[in-house]
């Protein structure tokens, strides 16, 4: 075997490899001998078929198998000897001319092919004991609990009809019939009867609810609005419309007493038990938010500490996935890059940076896990599947069967578990300091969230 490196640029390598025809012939001959005891050919006793006859019958197919196996074995040996870890599948170029192929399959010429690869760079891991990570922690206050219970009460609030002649105010529930038109023409989905609208809930298109303020039962108004530019229906997006609207009833929200009786309507023994349940839920929510903030901070630190060239093909793949998703969302919303105060080129540059970061962090996390023998057990994956199934009541078996028969979906469940275990490993070594923060600071928008791996 002769190997010549024809390209070495960064992480990209290309080799020209030649395997003598005599080597191929010897391997194919061994396969034919092995085949001798396995095939049945009329006119010959089992195991007595001459190899020469087998070659006439199976020679081309056996040589094709031999060539395929030789390429795999040769590549594996080459990559192992040079310490290469492949970022993507190798690209192999074989002879394509019919005459060359015939010569090769008949064993009359050497096997010569090229293999192009892109490798994962060597990654020097940082000393995680030097990492300083801040852990924001917010205490659940009585006010937080009271606010949470008030939100629950608001969603369970009842409404009662207002007195005759009363007008609708913010917070009232108005039952309406309406017919919408654009340029005088009724449009699909633009009519409704018995529709309930809570003024100020912002559940209808902008401007609709506000124009119901002051309306009385039995009164008809023409509401003039414009559909948002990012409205889900492209035909309606940005269009001015008029809705001939009649109010059939006006109802005011009723005060609801937050007491033991209210707690019992929710299946709890008392108000104290409701407060306990609300506090437990908030504690879990705050802990989840803390975890996300710590993880983002750690990923930022890993990003800073591991600057290397990411395999271009992996970056391209990650970028294309993100960009296709961005374009689909923008097209669906009817938005342009100008609406986002940017240009397509600037947006592409930003998303390519994010793609590069994600690939590098993925490689770093993988390297950490591999060097420290971090694995995900089947039990852990099984628990994740069960959790997914619980989120879809009535379809548990369908979910379970889906993951059992779909290796790719199972891998997608395994990946975040693996990532979290690696993150936990690093946090055990890092210097993590708690910092008391308010609930508002804990949940504040963080640009780093966009780039978290």
UniProtKB/Swiss-Prot annotation:
InterPro entries membership: PPIase_dom_sf, PPIase_FKBP_dom, Trig_fac, Trigger_fac_C, Trigger_fac_C_sf, Trigger_fac_ribosome-bd_bac, Trigger_fac_ribosome-bd_sf, Trigger_fact/SurA_dom_sf
Any Pfam family: FKBP_C
Catalysis performed (reactions): [protein]-peptidylproline (omega=180) = [protein]-peptidylproline (omega=0)
Chief localization: cytoplasm
Cystine connections: none
Domain of life of the source: Bacteria
Domain PPIase FKBP-type residues, every copy: 171-256
Keyword Isomerase set for record: yes
Gene Ontology cellular component list: cytoplasm
Top enzyme class: isomerase
A single GO molecular function term of this UniProt record: protein folding chaperone
Record localization: Cytoplasm
HAMAP family the record matches: Trigger_factor_Tig (MF_00303)
PANTHER family xrefs: TRIGGER FACTOR CHAPERONE AND PEPTIDYL-PROLYL CIS/TRANS ISOMERASE, TRIGGER FACTOR-LIKE PROTEIN TIG, CHLOROPLASTIC
Entry note about domains: Consists of 3 domains; the N-terminus binds the ribosome, the middle domain has PPIase activity, while the C-terminus has intrinsic chaperone activity on its own.
Family: Belongs to the FKBP-type PPIase family. Tig subfamily.
Protein name per the record: Trigger factor
């Amino acid at each position: 075997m002769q190997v010549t490196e024809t390209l070495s640029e960064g992480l990209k390598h290309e080799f020209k490899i030649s395997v003598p025809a005599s080597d191929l012939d010897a391997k194919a001959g061994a396969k034919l001998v092995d085949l001798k005891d396995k095939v049945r050919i009329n006119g010959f006793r089992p195991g007595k078929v001459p190899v020469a006859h087998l070659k006439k019958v199976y020679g081309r197919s056996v040589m094709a198998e031999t060539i395929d196996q030789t390429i795999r074995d040769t590549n594996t040996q080459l990559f192992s000897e040079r310490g290469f870890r492949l970022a993507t599948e190798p690209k192999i170029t074989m002879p394509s001319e019919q005459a060359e192929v015939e010569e090769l399959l008949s064993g009359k010429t050497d096997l010569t092919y090229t293999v192009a690869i892109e490798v994962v760079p060597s990654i020097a891991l940082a000393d995680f004991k030097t990492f300083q990570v801040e852990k924001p922690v917010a205490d659940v206050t009585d006010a937080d609990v009271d606010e949470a219970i008030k939100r629950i009460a608001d969603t369970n609030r009842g409404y009662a009809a207002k007195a005759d002649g009363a007008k609708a105010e913010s917070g009232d529930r108005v039952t309406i019939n309406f017919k919408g038109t654009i340029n005088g023409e009724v449009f699909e989905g633009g009519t409704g009867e018995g529709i309930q609208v809570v003024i100020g809930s912002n559940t209808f298109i902008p401007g609709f609810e506000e124009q119901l303020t002051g309306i009385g039962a039995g009164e008809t108004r023409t509401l003039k609005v414009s559909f948002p530019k990012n409205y889900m229906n492209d035909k309606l997006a940005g269009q001015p419309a008029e809705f001939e609207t009649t109010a059939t009833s006006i109802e005011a929200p009723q005060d609801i007493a937050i007491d033991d009786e209210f707690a019992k309507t929710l299946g709890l023994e008392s108000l104290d038990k409701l407060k306990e349940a609300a506090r437990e839920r908030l504690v879990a929510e705050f802990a989840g938010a803390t975890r996300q903030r710590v993880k983002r901070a750690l990923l930022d630190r890993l990003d800073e500490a591991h600057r290397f060239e990411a395999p271009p093909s992996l970056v391209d793949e990650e970028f294309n996935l993100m960009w296709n998703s961005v374009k689909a969302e923008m097209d669906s919303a009817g938005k342009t890059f100008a609406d986002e105060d940017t240009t397509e080129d600037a947006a592409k540059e930003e998303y390519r940076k994010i793609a590069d970061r994600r690939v590098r962090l993925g490689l770093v996390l993988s390297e950490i896990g591999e060097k420290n023998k971090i694995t995900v057990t089947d039990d852990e994956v099984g628990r994740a599947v069960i959790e997914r199934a619980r989120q879809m009541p009535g379809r548990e078996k369908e979910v379970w069967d889906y993951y059992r028969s779909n290796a790719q979906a199972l891998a997608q469940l395994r990946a975040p578990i693996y990532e979290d275990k690696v993150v936990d490993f690093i946090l055990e070594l890092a210097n993590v300091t708690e910092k008391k923060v308010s609930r508002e600071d804990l949940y504040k928008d963080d640009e780093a969230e966009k780039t978290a791996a």
